[in-house]
Curated annotation (Swiss-Prot):
Principal location class: nucleus
Catalytic activity field: ATP + H2O = ADP + phosphate + H(+)
Taxon lineage: Eukaryota, Fungi, Dikarya, Ascomycota, Pezizomycotina
Subcellular location: Nucleus, Nucleolus
Region described as Disordered: 39-60, 370-420, 612-649
Binding positions for ATP per the UniProt entry: A101, K102, T103, G104, S105, G106, K107, T108
SMART domains from the UniProt entry: DEXDc, HELICc
Keywords: ATP-binding, Helicase, Hydrolase, Nucleotide-binding, Nucleus, Ribosome biogenesis, RNA-binding, rRNA processing
Annotated source species: Aspergillus fumigatus (strain ATCC MYA-4609 / CBS 101355 / FGSC A1100 / Af293)
Pfam families recorded: DEAD (PF00270), Helicase_C (PF00271)
UniProt-listed PANTHER family: ATP-DEPENDENT RNA HELICASE RHLE-RELATED, DEAD-BOX HELICASE 56
EC number of this enzyme: 3.6.4.13
Record's protein name: ATP-dependent RNA helicase dbp9
Domain Helicase ATP-binding: residue ranges: 88-266
Database matches in Gene3D superfamilies: P-loop containing nucleotide triphosphate hydrolases
Amino acid sequence: MRKTFQPVVSYNQASFKGPSQRLLELCVVNMKRKLDANDVPSTEVEEEKNTKDADNTDFESLNLDPRLRQALIKEQFTKPTPVQSKAIPLALEGKDILARAKTGSGKTAAYVLPILQTILQKKAADPSLKATTGLILVPTRELAEQVQSVIIKFSAFCGKDVRSVNLTQKVSDAVQRTMLADYPDLIVSTPARVIANLGTSALSLENLTHLVIDEADLVLSYGYDEDINALAKAIPRGVQTFLMSATLTSEVDTLKGLFCRSPVILKLEDKEDEGAGISQFVVRCAEDEKFLLTYVIFKLQLIKGKVIIFVGDIDRCYRLKLFLEQFGIKSCVLNSELPINSRIHVVQEFNKGVYDIIIAADEQEVMGLRTSSKKSKEATDGDDEAKDKMGSSEDEDNEPEQSGKSARPEKRRKTSGKAKDYGISRGIDFQNVACVLNFDLPTTSKSYTHRIGRTGRAGKAGMALSFVVPADKFGKHKPTSFPTAKHDESVLAKIVKKQAKLGHEVKPYHFEMKQVDAFRYRMTDALRAVTRLAIQEARAREIRQELVKSEKLKRHFEENPEELKQLRHDGELRAARIQPHLKHIPDYLMPSKGRKGISSEDVGFVGFRKSGDNRIRKAREKNRGKGKGRKPSGVRKVDPLKTFNRGRK
């Protein structure tokens, strides 16, 4: 299928409000993006690669450097994924690539391996070569750290031939300038950090040969449109570009027009794509019953394995954490307020199995950061590609409740630097997640798809459980009410419709409420203790603790890695009122079927009851016979009643 790029100049520029429109204007002005190395306008050829069955390709047939193959063996990469088997050969041929594949399909290795291969070939021809030839752009710091770790693993046997720098690390500008002065081969960064270093001349892109924009559909949505605008002017012509995304949206199409030359478009659709292998359930419940059901699920161990709980904002994170703490249920909090080192460490420890429950605030989705991009899509909906997006067109009216509030989230987005580079529902590689619990239902079906994509990865089974508040139950319990729950039913209808198009079913799940109601009074006691003041104090206390762990102890832990194991993030934050009795479940509350599973019959002897007289008193009586408790000999015992002399007045 052939399409010739035709710049659109007939738009009314006054109507351009979203990042996609502003960048489309740049695409018209900055036509050098569409010229090849000989300054000749290139015709944009889109070759669609639809792959439903995995090839028999192996890493040996990809002709990679032996050092890279050795690293793959060490990391137990036995067979390339569909996106790797298609993208790597094309990348080694020097073609621009736009790949759509779900998160967890191996997109990172699909662009890291060919870039490393090219660097090693250049170093073999000229060992003294020092130049920054690769730039990898990601929307969040967490994803930057993840990509950097992949580069380190794959270049483990390359010695000093490959050097990479992560610009999102929290170091001083002087340290960052020193790292860049040595001309690292690869740079991983957010767009904002690249522009900042270009402005100070600490970074030079003159020798750049590879540009990667990972999670391309999120880069503009996270507020980097101005940075991308400036970056498009700074990148030289002829750079090989990789656009990797889980969805093909209008933002991706805009980036393609800015940076790509005749890209090959890969639409990978394997049999496990988009939620296959994930059992999806929905529970209709009142607002306070969300807490009740969460308590029952974890206290009765109804879900085995690691769980990610998605909530609407940071306050909900701490409200739920403090609530679960009172029942002895430990959990971690993950949000944009925490230092980046703490967030990365939480994810790493969760993947190692140190923690079982993470409560994550999906702030980017709730703050409405994608509303402007959705509006811009309506203006550029003429492109056929923008319509073929995993149901992205359905999301345009997914959020009616936010249309009147769009100005406030936009303002908050611009002033919130922490939230700008934080994202948890996309890109982060959570491993072996058994269940995703949507405590607060997302406001779009697109966000729902990304959330449940945290489980059921690499062909494993997973479960997604979502709480939905019916319209007639919204606002009935003010302390636990959340604004977005008002439209849960309309959002659920769109989610069900979209999942049905993908061939998946969202099934209703019914709890036996007669048995669950027995725990309601305990839930009520726990919720009373979680006051607004307790939440504010918990947030402040957590930030203080994590800042100490993140900054002052970072160097110490680098020198003493064994002590890092004691750095935990699931400690108690302490509610306003401690109620120890809530941590234990009386036998009369236990369901008859579940009583045996969590009973103490098979527990060894624990000496709670006295088995005899007081031990100290018994020892004292015994010692008296040995003389230890007797007074020295020669001292006569005196009876005070017989020797008492009142005396005369």
